[in-house]
């Protein structure tokens, strides 16, 4: 998400936060484990937290540097399935919404992503194809993004360079066998990617988790 470099003073932090728009996250540049990480909903909250976060960074990590990032309320996790042949051709096969999560793990995945504007969907596809082409991507991969529905903008998270558990819902709506494509590509016979993708219908995948209620719902085999 949009953010700043290291902040030299509280005044600079206040000016930068106003430009980013509240809420913002004040972060210690050397932080870890949530130490030196504070949400600020307004200028008063930023003023109150600034010296504390700097002090935590210095005490725990010998580095008092801090910076700001925009905080996205009710952020959605949207990802795009791509496939590249390693020859410069990349195809986007639609998006998946993976926003319903528990313990930072995806629980419900669905395609198409609900309430995603058509223009935003097109931008997501184009950005993912451009990303794949930039690295001459080969095989299946997933571009992952944070989507801010309030501002109707998305921010890049990462690329998962493998076939993900939720890939069958994309297969169900495109009638494309991604595993077959991966095998063909590995065998030196990549599929033609100059095709038009028009996903049909909708699909949902749900993961089942076993948890132990006696042990604070820790994962249980």
Model-derived segments and their meaning:
Residues 28, 33, 41-221:
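ATP-dependent carboxylate activation and anion-phosphoryl transfer catalytic cores
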């Amino acid at each position: 998400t949009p953010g700043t470099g290291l902040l030299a003073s509280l005044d600079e932090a206040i000016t930068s936060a106003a430009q980013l728009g509240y809420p913002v996250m004040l972060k210690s540049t050397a932080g870890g484990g949530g130490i030196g990480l504070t949400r600020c909903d307004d200028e008063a909250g930023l003023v109150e937290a600034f010296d504390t976060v700097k002090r935590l960074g210095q005490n725990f990590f010998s580095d008092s540097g801090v910076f700001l990032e925009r905080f996205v309320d009710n952020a959605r996790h949207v990802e795009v399935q791509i496939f590249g042949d390693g020859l410069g051709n990349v195809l986007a096969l639609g998006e998946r919404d993976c926003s319903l999560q528990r313990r930072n793990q995806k629980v419900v995945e669905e395609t198409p992503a609900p309430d995603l504007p058509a223009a935003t969907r097109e931008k997501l596809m184009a950005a993912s194809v451009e990303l794949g082409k930039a690295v001459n991507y080969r095989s299946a991969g997933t571009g992952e993004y944070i989507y801010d529905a309030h501002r109707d903008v998305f921010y890049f998270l990462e690329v998962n360079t493998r076939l993900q558990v939720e890939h069958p819902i994309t297969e169900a709506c495109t009638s494309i066998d991604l595993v077959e494509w991966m095998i063909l590509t590995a065998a030196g016979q990549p599929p033609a990617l100059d095709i038009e993708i028009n996903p049909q219908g909708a699909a949902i995948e749900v993961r089942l988790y076993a948890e132990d209620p006696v042990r604070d719902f820790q994962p249980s085999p």
